[in-house]
Amino acid sequence: TEPKNLEEQAISLVGTDIYEKLIKGYTQKQWGRPCNELPSFIIKRLPVRLTFDNNYFNALYQGIPEGGYTKMVANMLNDSELSGSIEVRLGVDYLASADAKEELDSQAEKVVYTGAIDAYFDYKLGNLEYRSVRFETETLDTPNFQGNAAVNYTDAETPWTRIIEHKWFEFGKDENGDDLPKTVISREYSSEWKPGDEPYYPVNDEKNGALYAQYK
């Protein structure tokens, strides 16, 4: 029979031992719900390999922009060939009012809205459920905290889901190639979204999927 929920799907993929050690606690922290109440397709997106390849993606070449994505976008906006042709407005709420939306819509033939679909329709069918994330950032007086950019904490007892050590996204060196004497870490806490919070990702269960389909 087909797995009916995430727990059954995970056990069928990796067995009970790995499920209990690596998946159950982390998943329930991330989603705030028991694994047997989450749909099976959530776990299907994760690659399962019986090799030493620890990459998430299968692409031959993988990387991040040098200096980060903020610098990449800034360079694109400052390109001499595009200078003056790209207007950037910050702190603008597209949905603040009908007049604001109409004014912004008039700026282009096509508008791409990347916000929440229920907010776009003014919650006429009700609120979708989301998860939010809180970051606790700390500067440590050590050149190395965990030796890796991201370490997941898969147990249920640790309140954070993972710790990011930012320097390792840039190989831990300064502009001269020297080791950095300090390091910055961020603990990541997953939490239930409420109005006023930033929604990071939707809750992909049957109830929310049905409401999302109505909004579409």
Where are these regions (language model features)?
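Mid-domain catalytic core of redox enzymes
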Residues: 92-215
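Active-site/ligand-binding neighborhood in enzyme catalytic cores
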Residues: 1-109
